[in-house]
Amino acid sequence: MKNLLLYLLSFFIVLPLVAQKASPPNDNAFNTVNYRSIAPLRINGEQGVSAPFVGTIGKSVLVAGGCNFPTTPAAQGGKKQFYADIYELTNIDDDTQQWHKIAQLPQPLAYGVSVSVPHGMVCVGGTGDGQTSSARVYLLHTDRQSHLLVDELPSLPLALDNMAGAYGGGYIYVAGGLSNGKAVNAAFRMRYPHGKEWERLPDFPGAARVQPAAAVQNNATSSCFYLVGGFAPIDGDQPAVAHTDGYYYNAAARQWIKIADIVPHGRSEAMTLAGAYGISSGCAHIVFVGGVNKQRFERAVNMPLLLKKAEFTAKKYHTQAAIQALESLKAEQAAYLFHPEEWYQFNDELVIYHTITNTWVTESQSPLLARAGTGIVKCGNEWVVVNGETKPGIRSSAVTAIKMTMRPTFGWLNWTVLIAYLVGMVLLGYYFMRRGGDADDFFKGGGRIPWWAAGISIYATMLSAITYMAYPAKAYATDWTYYPMLVTILIVSFPVIKYYLPFFRRLNVTSAYEYLERRFNATTRLMASALFIIFMVARMALVLYLPSLALTAVTGIDLYICIVLMALVTIVYCTMGGVEAVVWGDVVQGFILVGGALFAVGYLIWGTEGGFEGFCQIVMDDNKLRLFNWSFDYRSATFWVIILGGMANNLISYTSDQTVIQRYLTTKDEAGARRSILLNGVMSVFVSIAFFAIGAGLYTFFKTHPAELDFTMAKADTIFPFFMMSQLPPGIAGLLIAAIFAATMSTISSNINSVATAFSVDFYKRFRPSATDKATLTVARRTCIVSGVLGMGIALLMATWDILSLLDFFQEILGLLSSGLGGLFLMGIFCPRIGGRAALIGFVCGVAAVFLTRYLTDTSFLLYGFIGMFSSIIVGLICSCFIRESKSLAGLCWRERI
C-alpha cells in the first residue's frame, strides 16, 4: 500500500519538473470566427433595408419593416421609404433557400427594437415616417398550422424610435432613443410572457442616447441590461456627442451603474458604438457588430452647428479667412454623401465586452461587418446580420452568418497525466478489493484508518470539486465574502467533537441514522435515511457535472460523454474497494488538490501584468478581497447571512451527513476521530485561502489579458479549467485537471459508499436482520452501482439547465434537502422531552418551512439550513407539550449520556 501511494505521489510531484516552461501569454488563439454569406435580402430593387426588425421563430429568420431609398439615392435628394413587409428565410443552412414575403406589419415601421422570445418575435416602437414615434408593440408568432400571426401587446408608455433593447431574465428592456424627435433618457421593461404593462425604470444617467446598442447578459451575480454607445444630438449650442461609455441596470438596487469606456485592450483611443447592435455570447461576454466611426460621425452631425458658427463669424468680421472657412464647410457638407464606402470607416471588427473584468477587446476583422443600422439575431449556433447601410443612404442586401467557436488544445502530455491518474485510482480500488474483508471492512475500514488520513478524507470529501472550481469561480466573479463560511467549519468542529462524536462512537453505529431509531422510532430513521440518500444522489450529480464541464472546456469532448466517463470510473473504483479505498484515495487526491492550488496561485500572480505589485494594485482598486458585507439585507450574501448560514449548513453536514460521520467511525479510537475533525477544520480555514486566491488571481490575470478569455464560455464555473488549458505548460495543465478529477472522485466515491451504507444498514439489514455479511456486502456493492447511475442520470439532466453559479446551487440544495436532518439530531441530543412523534412532526414542518421560504420569499438560500433546523426544533418542542412519550433515554441524549 505504501509503495503504491509513494509511486502515485512521486509521479505527480516530479512531473512539473519536466514540464515545458510557459511562454508569455499571447492573444486568444482558441476562438475562431468564420463568416459566410447566405441568401441576400433585396426589397424594392437591388438593395436591402436599414433598421429592420429581425428575429427568429424556430429555425426561421424573420425580417420585418425597415427603410431605404428605392428610386432616387439619398445623395441626390431621394425620399426615404418605410416598409411593413415581413420576410422569412426558413433554413439558413440551405444554400438553395430564398427569402419569401409572408405577411405585413399593421403599419410601416423602422428604427424600433426587436427581440426573439420563446414564443416568437416582439417588435417594439419605431417610426413610419422618420418624424413620429410609435408606442405600439407587436408579437409575431405562428399557429399550429405554422401560419404567421401578428398580435398586439401592451403599448409603451412613451412612443419611441431609434432606441435599443434586449430580452433576458424574463424581461423585455428598451431604453434611450427619440420620442417624436426629442432625445430621451427613458428606460422601460415588461415581464414576458405574462406582463400586463411596461414598468418605468429610473432614467439612465448623463446625456440622452440615440441609436445606442444593448444586450442582456450575466454579470457576477445576476442578469443585467447593458446600454452602451449611441449619440446625443445637438442641443441648442451644445454639439452632438457620440458616446464612448455605457451603463448597466441593476434590478435589485434599481440603479444604473457605469461600466468602463469603450477603449479596447491595447489601444488608447475610445470608440463609439452608435448605430451598432449587441448580442450576448457565452455566460459573460457581449459582442457588438457594426457602427459608425466616432470622428467622421460627429463631424457630420455637427455640421449644421459648425455652419451656423462659421456664417456668424463671416458676417461679423468679413475676413477672407472666415469666408473661406465657411465655403470649405459648405463644400464638405455637399460632398459628404459622395465618398467611397471606405472613407466613412464604419466599424469592421467585433467589439467584445466582458462583464466580470469590465474590459473591452476587439476580435476578427471583416469588410462584411462594416455596416451600421443592421439587424442581428442568434439562429442556432450562429449570429445572422441582416442588411444595414455600408455608407449613409446606401443599403446593403447582404445577409451574413457569423460563427464563433472555441477550439481547445489539450495535448498528449496532458492526456498522459490524466489517464495515468485515472488508471492509478482504479488500481487503488483493485488493491483493496484483493485484500478482501467483511462488511465491517467495506463500511468502516475495519477501524484501522489513521486519524490524519481520516481528516484529509473528510476535507477532500466535503470540499472537493466545489472547492477546486466553484470557489475560485465565485471569488473571480465577486470577492471573498464567502470565505467566512469556511471559517465556520472550524468553529463547528468544537461542538461536534464535544456533543456529537461521543454518541456516534460509543453507540457503535454503522449508519448515523441508527441513532435516530434508538432515540425516536423506526419511522424517523427511515425518513431521515431516505432524505439523506436523495440529497447524496443530487450532490453526486452536481459534483459529477463540475469536472465534466472542465473536461469539456479543455478538450472539446461532448459534455454528456464526459459525465458518463467520469461516473463509470468512479463507480468502478469505489465499488471494488469500499471505504478504505475511498479514504486512501482521498489522501492522494488531497495532496494533489493542495499542491495544484498553491502552484496555480503563484502562476496566476506571476502572469498578471506587473507581477505581485500589479496583482495587489488591481485587487485593491476593484475591491476583490472584500471579506465582509455589513448590510442587513437578508436576500444577499451579507456577513450575517454568511455566518448564520455557514454555521447552520456546516452543522448539518458534520452532524447528520453519513458521508462525514462514516469517517468518524473509521479511526481506531475516539481520540483519533477528534484529531481528524480538527485537522479538517484547520485545513478548511487555511488551505481554502489558496482557492480564493486563485479566484482573485484569475480576475487580475484576465483583466490584464482580456483578449485571452474564451468569448464563448458557456459556464462561469469553467474559468479555472480554461486557464489551465490555455495558459499553463503541458503536463502542469494535465496535473491540475487531474486534481479536479481527484476532487470529484473523492466526493462521489464517498457519497456512493455512504449511500450504500445507509441503504444496506437502514433498509436492507433493518428488514433482513438475519442477512449474512456476504449478502449485505453484495447489496452494498449493487447499491453503489445504482446510486452512481442515478447520479449520472441527474447530471446529464443538469447539463441542460442554466445555472449561473454551481456553488450557490449546491448551497441551495443543501439547505432544501438536509436542514431537517440537522434538526433531528439537534432534537435527539439536546431536547430529551421531544419524543418520536413530536420529532417527526417537527422534521416534516422544518422541511416544509424551507420549501415555502424558497418559493414565497426572496430570502437568501444560505439561510435555508438555519430556517429548516430552527423551524423543526420549535415545532418539535411545541408538539412535545401535547404529545408525551415514555422511553428510556440512557446514553441517547446529552443529559442522559453514559
Question: Where on the chain are the PLM-derived regions?
Answer:
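Intrinsically disordered, low-complexity serine/threonine-rich segments
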Residues: I13-V14, G275, E341, G891
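Positively charged n-region of N-terminal signal peptides that target proteins for export
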Residues: M1-L4, R833
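Residue-level detector of intrinsically disordered/flexible regions characterized by low predicted structural confidence
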Residues: L4-L5, A22-S23, Q211-A213, I259-A260, ...
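Membrane-embedded helix-loop-helix hairpins and adjacent transmembrane boundary segments
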Residues: R407-I898
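Short amphipathic alpha-helical segments
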Residues: K2, A51-P52, A84, D440, ...
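Bacterial N-terminal signal peptides
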Residues: Y7-P16
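Kelch-like beta-propeller repeat domains
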Residues: K21-T409
